[in-house]
Regions:
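A short helix-to-beta-strand connector/capping loop
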Residues: 49-55, 116-120
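Short, well-ordered coil/turn residues at beta-beta hairpins
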Residues: 74-75, 97, 230, 239
């Protein structure tokens, strides 16, 4: 079987996938795209250490011309859908890590692009792949806890100490500008994965923009909460964000 030729768009968020593509026996890392030259140099050194030939690009339009079977999207989280659609329409499979889309309009356009292309689209919300999440799924699907009626997911992570690093010091970086309910997948994803149930309605709330985050450039609330109704009538409370708590909290209950 020939190896799957993989390109990664986004060298910082995508570094884990870059390493896995280099190490996986059925994959071949062929290209990386990132606008920051230091990250490309890091990828160049990593590829050289492993004896792998990888093309490096600073522009997506050049990157998409490379001979690739699949693309890992690890670019800015609020820009995945347009790039996923371009990759699908060019005949590539797509893995998005993370997020899927920023609006309902983008969600519809993405689904339609997948259907037209016939290619595989994988949403790689990483907290769905923890051992504990698989244990939750196995127990629920086996019927150990009956039918789900209420669940809670919590992901509290104060990133203020690394904010300049993860935003590259950009005042208009998506982490500074997007509404706080946007990045809900760490808290909500494992519940949906474990139960296999689809959400049918949602209402969301933001906390106020706390001074310690506002000083770093954020424009939205410091944390977000969603109340989600699932297709069987179950309710899920999802809370996430950068509230001050040491240590951080990752917690799921069903």
């Amino acid at each position: 079987m020939s190896k799957v030729k993989i390109g990664v768009f986004g060298g910082y968020r995508g570094m884990t996938m870059i390493r896995q593509a280099i190490d996986h026996p059925d994959a071949s890392l062929v290209a990386v795209c990132d606008k920051y030259e230091p990250l490309l140099e890091q990828c160049r050194s990593l590829a050289s250490e492993h004896g792998v030939k990888v093309e490096l690009f600073a522009d997506f339009d050049d990157f998409i011309q490379c001979d690739m079977d699949a693309v890992v999207l690890a670019n800015y989280a609020n820009e995945h859908a347009p790039y996923a659609i371009r990759c699908l329409e060019s005949g590539r499979h797509v893995m998005s890590e993370v997020l899927t889309c920023a609006t309902l309009k983008e969600a519809v356009e993405l689904v339609e692009a997948v259907e037209r292309s016939g290619k595989v689209y994988q949403y790689a919300e990483n907290y769905c792949y923890f051992n504990t999440t698989f244990e939750m799924r196995q127990r629920y699907q086996r019927g150990d806890i009956g039918e789900l009626m209420h669940a809670e997911g919590e992901y509290i992570h104060d990133c203020s100490s690394i904010w300049p690093q993860i935003t590259y010091g950009e005042r208009e970086h998506w982490r500074n500008t997007m509404y706080s309910t946007f990045y809900c997948t760490h808290s909500l994803g494992p519940i949906l994965f474990a139960s296999g149930l689809r959400p049918v309605s949602v209402v969301g709330f933001e906390t106020r923009n706390m001074p310690f985050m506002r000083e770093l450039g954020t424009k939205a609330g410091t944390a977000g909460m969603e109340i989600v109704m699932l297709e069987n009538g179950a309710m899920v409370k999802s809370i996430h964000g950068g509230l001050k708590r040491e240590p951080g909290s990752i917690n799921y209950q069903m």
